[in-house]
């Protein structure tokens, strides 16, 4: 069994992740904490570590037949291709994703996230493929991506050439 929709959550900026202070005060953030295994106490680093341990526990069955594509989440980028932290609700870095997946390669497969408006989008696409990404993940309305934007056609072409499918939310 492979559950393609498993989100990596993280709070600590020490692992390249980010949670916007406004988002930390939102109802969505409260609900994420309520309905996930994200611990409610401890430092951000301790909570991140405990969350990953909880994920491992979910997949650690006697038959070792479960796997998951673990998903990163890129940020919002401005018109010059720079990360806009003010508009980014949260960011789960590809580097952190690969770090977590490398500890359990039999059960966790990396689903990277690359916003096509990044200045280095094509380079990042190549990099994550080389590191073992099995797909690219977007949430267009949260990442400021217009999937019909003709400016991102080269990104789609390169994704196709690399054999990377796109997993995306419609709302």
Per-segment meaning from a language model:
Residues 1-171:
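Helix-coil boundary/capping segments in enzymes
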């Amino acid at each position: 069994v492979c559950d393609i929709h498993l989100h990596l959550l993280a709070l600590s900026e020490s692992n390249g992740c980010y949670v916007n202070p406004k988002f930390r005060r939102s109802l969505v953030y409260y609900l994420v904490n309520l309905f996930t295994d994200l611990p409610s106490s401890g430092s951000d680093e301790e909570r991140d570590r405990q969350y990953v341990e909880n994920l491992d526990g979910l997949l650690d069955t006697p038959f070792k037949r479960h796997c998951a594509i673990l998903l990163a989440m890129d940020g919002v980028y401005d018109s010059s291709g720079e990360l806009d932290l003010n508009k980014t609700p949260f960011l789960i870095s590809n580097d952190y994703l690969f770090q977590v997946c490398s500890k359990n390669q039999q059960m966790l497969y990396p689903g990277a996230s690359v916003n096509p408006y990044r200045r280095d989008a094509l380079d990042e696409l190549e990099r994550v493929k080389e590191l073992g990404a099995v797909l690219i993940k977007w949430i267009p309305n949260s990442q400021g991506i217009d999937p019909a934007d003709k400016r991102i056609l080269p990104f789609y072409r390169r994704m196709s050439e690399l054999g990377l499918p796109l997993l995306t939310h419609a709302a």
